[in-house]
Amino acid sequence: MKLNEIPAVPGNQQSRNRVGRGPGSGNGKTAGRGHKGQKARSGGFHKSGFEGGQMPLQRRLPKRGFKNFTRKEYTIVQVEDLEKFFDAGSEVNAEALNDLGLLGKKQKSGIKLLANGDITKAITVYVDKASAAAVAKMEAAGGKVVLAVVADPEGDA
């Protein structure tokens, strides 16, 4: 039996309440909107944030900051993840991390290695960025961190 084949419990499904369909329905005439006023009319209610003519909060507060569209966002991989998922002597790259599901679904600018946890295995890791503490831990365990060289778009040609 599948979920879509389970029958409904008798008396459990209530039909939609159709308003404005005569006095016998219990919701005729005003259709539950009360008498007159802006809320009773068609065409919607005031827009969200409207404060009755008073200057809205969103316009009273000053503008601040900006959104940096060239900002790079990195997927974080911890040293303890390498200890947990990889054997000594293995080479770890983006493909290996992705196969284990460590990179997540969202594609980001690159991979950054951080120093959370401990490592005892000598592993070679290919990443875009790494913290100084992470590099120190990897080298202390006999491993190596290889950083990807990114070409400078405004560099000398």
UniProtKB/Swiss-Prot annotation:
<keyword id="KW-0699">rRNA-binding</keyword>
<dbReference type="InterPro" id="IPR005749">
    <property type="entry name" value="Ribosomal_uL15_bac-type"/>
</dbReference>
<keyword id="KW-0687">Ribonucleoprotein</keyword>
<dbReference type="GO" id="GO:0003735">
    <property type="term" value="F:structural constituent of ribosome"/>
</dbReference>
<feature type="compositionally biased region" description="Gly residues">
    <location>
        <begin position="21"/>
        <end position="31"/>
    </location>
</feature>
<dbReference type="GO" id="GO:0006412">
    <property type="term" value="P:translation"/>
</dbReference>
<comment type="similarity">
    <text>Belongs to the universal ribosomal protein uL15 family.</text>
</comment>
<dbReference type="GO" id="GO:0019843">
    <property type="term" value="F:rRNA binding"/>
</dbReference>
<protein>
    <recommendedName>
        <fullName>Large ribosomal subunit protein uL15</fullName>
    </recommendedName>
</protein>
<comment type="function">
    <text>Binds to the 23S rRNA.</text>
</comment>
<dbReference type="InterPro" id="IPR036227">
    <property type="entry name" value="Ribosomal_uL15/eL18_sf"/>
</dbReference>
<comment type="subunit">
    <text>Part of the 50S ribosomal subunit.</text>
</comment>
<dbReference type="InterPro" id="IPR030878">
    <property type="entry name" value="Ribosomal_uL15"/>
</dbReference>
<dbReference type="Pfam" id="PF00828">
    <property type="entry name" value="Ribosomal_L27A"/>
</dbReference>
<feature type="region of interest" description="Disordered">
    <location>
        <begin position="1"/>
        <end position="64"/>
    </location>
</feature>
<dbReference type="InterPro" id="IPR021131">
    <property type="entry name" value="Ribosomal_uL15/eL18"/>
</dbReference>
<keyword id="KW-0694">RNA-binding</keyword>
<keyword id="KW-0689">Ribosomal protein</keyword>
<dbReference type="GO" id="GO:0022625">
    <property type="term" value="C:cytosolic large ribosomal subunit"/>
</dbReference>
<dbReference type="InterPro" id="IPR001196">
    <property type="entry name" value="Ribosomal_uL15_CS"/>
</dbReference>
